[in-house]
């Protein structure tokens, strides 16, 4: 029997179990083991309440980063990137190494992370880089008859909605809608189709519907590939912010407030001299509890689980966000 220690975390209530492989060397962490463990532990019927996925933290393969993040979704599939998860990994590693900023390796890039000024209620807040940003069809991959999809109607997907597609580096399909469309079943129907066998996004895609709230604020709801609807998706909020800035020809460096069912984050963008775009995602990194489970013959059993006071703290922000969103309906 293997005893696995974890930290239950969330970014914008996009929740995960964080497992430090260096602290859990009793397990042979193969890709198959990571997937099976994620499927079992992330089951919402599990005594620990499940999660959207597991963040596996291990040593980096490179000299500079202080660690590496691997993301496995609740269905066992691998996510190339997770912005909400990266904020919690950033906090975990920075606290572990007594640093305020560093680099963390992900599956597609080495990214800057740092401790940031709290967004409110003394909630632990971290800033993480989201990149690389690509628009070409191959990066998603996408087959809708164009090399770059930006604010265009795709009749095969919907006869009225205008879509944009971007990888950051996981793929996102984005459309701006009004409250009537948000209240309909369009998003679930479209996203479910595009995340099953289909000719347009063969690897699936994260689908976000975005509502404008003001010049400096948007609301984002995302159907995540491999998960379904979540309280928030960090890379989706980043991607939607970029598309909004491009549509409105906004100043990239100006922070955009992004509201979601899990709270609020801020996103800024920048373009370097070579024209390469990178995004900065700023939001909470909440540690909900610490505990342990046994993992034996494919069965995951709760052993310990001790809550922290941080979730109650975060709920104050959620309450404020919900009150604000009611005024925008």
UniProtKB/Swiss-Prot annotation:
SUPFAM superfamilies: Diaminopimelate epimerase-like
Record-marked site positions (Could be important to modulate the pK values of the two catalytic cysteine residues): 172, 224
Reactions catalysed according to its record: (2S,6S)-2,6-diaminopimelate = meso-2,6-diaminopimelate
Record-linked InterPro entries: DAP_epimerase_AS, DAP_epimerase_DapF
GO MF annotations in UniProt: diaminopimelate epimerase activity
Pfam family membership, one: DAP_epimerase
Pathway connected to this protein: Amino-acid biosynthesis; L-lysine biosynthesis via DAP pathway; DL-2,6-diaminopimelate from LL-2,6-diaminopimelate: step 1/1
Job of this protein: Catalyzes the stereoinversion of LL-2,6-diaminopimelate (L,L-DAP) to meso-diaminopimelate (meso-DAP), a precursor of L-lysine and an essential component of the bacterial peptidoglycan.
GO cellular component, as recorded: cytosol
EC numbers, comma separated: 5.1.1.7
Species of origin: Listeria innocua serovar 6a (strain ATCC BAA-680 / CLIP 11262)
Binding site for substrate: 14, 73, 83-84, 170, 206, 224-225, 234-235
Protein known as: Diaminopimelate epimerase
């Amino acid at each position: 029997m293997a005893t696995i220690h974890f930290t239950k975390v969330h970014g914008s209530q996009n929740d995960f179990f964080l497992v430090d492989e260096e602290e859990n060397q009793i397990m042979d962490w193969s890709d198959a083991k990571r997937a099976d463990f994620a499927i079992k532990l992330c089951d919402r019927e599990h005594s620990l309440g499940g999660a959207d996925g597991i963040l596996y933290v291990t040593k980096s393969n490179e000299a500079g980063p202080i660690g590496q993040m691997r993301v496995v979704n609740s269905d066992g599939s691998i996510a190339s990137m997770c912005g909400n998860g990266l904020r919690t990994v950033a906090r975990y590693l920075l606290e572990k190494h007594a640093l305020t900023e560093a680099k963390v390796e992900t599956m597609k890039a080495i990214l800057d992370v740092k401790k940031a000024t709290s967004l409110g209620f003394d909630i632990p807040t971290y800033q993480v880089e989201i990149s690389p940003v690509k628009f070409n069809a191959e990066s998603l991959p996408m087959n809708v008859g164009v090399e770059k999809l930006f604010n265009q109607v795709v009749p095969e997907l919907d006869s009225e909605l205008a879509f944009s597609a971007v990888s950051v580096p996981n793929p996102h399909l984005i459309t701006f809608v009004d409250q009537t469309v948000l209240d309909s079943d369009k998003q679930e129907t479209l996203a479910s189709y595009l995340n099953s066998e289909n000719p347009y996004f063969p690897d699936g895609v994260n689908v976000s519907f975005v509502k404008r709230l003001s010049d400096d604020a948007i609301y984002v709801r995302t159907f995540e590939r491999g998960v379904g609807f979540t309280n928030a998706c960090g890379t989706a909020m980043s991607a939607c912010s970029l598309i909004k800035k491009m549509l409105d020809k906004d100043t990239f460096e100006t922070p955009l407030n992004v509201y979601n069912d899990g709270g609020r984050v801020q996103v800024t963008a920048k373009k370097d001299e070579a024209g390469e775009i990178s995004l900065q995602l700023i939001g909470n990194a909440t540690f909900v509890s610490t505990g342990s489970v046994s993992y034996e013959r494919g069965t995951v059993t709760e052993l310990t689980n001790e809550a922290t006071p941080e979730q109650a703290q975060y709920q104050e922000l959620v309450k404020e966000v919900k009150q604000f969103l009611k005024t925008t309906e």
